[in-house]
């Protein structure tokens, strides 16, 4: 109840762009939110950064985490659904803009390479299996 939803401005607009989506997402309209454009540094210290990666949806994002022991981790969101998708650069079936998705894939891979980041695909069971189980967590 006291949380603030951090949402990309284009994503929020997309969520309410049709009568059907307005109805489906009506509860979100009541939530306290911070809308942003571009990348968003959550705490202003570079440790948690929401990365703009449009294509899957207009305001799709990935997440960059800098952990004291684990290093830099990138969570793909829906940019990739499986390791095979990443390796072959397959665009997900549900996608609003294939060209933007492909540009986001190039950008994501550039960031991952430049930072030497560990990439976690949240829809990939093998990636999820390697994460600590609650109440444990990455350090």
Feature locations, PLM:
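Classical protein tyrosine phosphatase
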Residues: 1
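Metallo-beta-lactamase
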Residues: 4, 8-52, 100-116
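Short, glycine-/Ser/Thr-/acidic-enriched flexible segments
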Residues: 12, 56, 126
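Catalytic core of the metallo-beta-lactamase
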Residues: 34-83
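Cap/insert and terminal regions of metallo-dependent hydrolase folds
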Residues: 62-139
